[in-house]
């Protein structure tokens, strides 16, 4: 008795004529067998495409996984996103982040750079603070120097006034003044030039008209000396 296939067709001998419903049909193709062969061919092609995609580093598509019809057709989908069971990145963004992580600087270098930045900022702040302190100190010292100079000048003026008053109050002050003028005249002789003789003579005279120490009227002599000083005689 011949064996029957799942669709009720008797299984013929390999290479023999196909029989349908007990009737021999030489050259007639079984539609069920052709359909199964076509499905197997498509499944084999899909599996080959998935294999090539995985080798290229890509994840199999959602439609492709569902078309395969296997029990793990939806294993690669979670919360609307694809994931890959391997250790590699799932997409280009993950790959970029992975490269950045691998190429990122070590923790020690990052800490050293942060410490250097903080140290430079502290040095800049300290330099600005010291500069402000030096400027303030320099201004203060300059003001103190000007104050000391002014005080010394006032003291010098006061001492000079006291010395002048004491000199003129002492006896023979006029004589001392004449002697000093004569000494100055003698010192100028060596350095004199022609035509300045009367000018040197005028230095020895007191031309103050209000002087009360003069017992005689010397106004005429005073006028003569002044005229000779202004217009010396020509030899």
Swiss-Prot record:
Biased composition (Gly residues): 13-25
Modified residues (N6-acetyllysine): 210, 229
Phosphoserine modifications at: 104, 193, 223
The entry's keywords: Acetylation, Calcium, Cell cycle, Cell division, Coated pit, Cytoplasm, Cytoplasmic vesicle, Cytoskeleton, Membrane, Mitosis, Phosphoprotein
Region (Disordered): 1-32
Any Pfam family matching the protein: Clathrin_lg_ch
Spans annotated as Involved in binding clathrin heavy chain: 99-161
Single GO BP term: cell division
Chief location category: membrane
Subcellular location: Cytoplasmic vesicle membrane; Membrane, Coated pit; Cytoplasm, Cytoskeleton, Spindle
Topology in the lipid bilayer: Peripheral membrane protein
Cellular component GO terms, alphabetical: clathrin coat of coated pit; clathrin coat of trans-Golgi network vesicle; cytoplasmic vesicle; glutamatergic synapse; postsynaptic endocytic zone; spindle
GO molecular function terms noted in the UniProt entry: structural molecule activity
Subunit: Clathrin coats are formed from molecules containing 3 heavy chains and 3 light chains. Interacts with CALY; the interaction stimulates clathrin self-assembly and clathrin-mediated endocytosis. Interacts with CKAP5 and TACC3 forming the TACC3/ch-TOG/clathrin complex located at spindle inter-microtubules bridges; the complex implicates clathrin triskelions.
Role, per record: Clathrin is the major protein of the polyhedral coat of coated pits and vesicles. Acts as a component of the TACC3/ch-TOG/clathrin complex proposed to contribute to stabilization of kinetochore fibers of the mitotic spindle by acting as inter-microtubule bridge.
Family: Belongs to the clathrin light chain family.
Name of the molecule in the record: Clathrin light chain A
Taxonomy of the source species: Eukaryota, Metazoa, Chordata, Craniata, Vertebrata
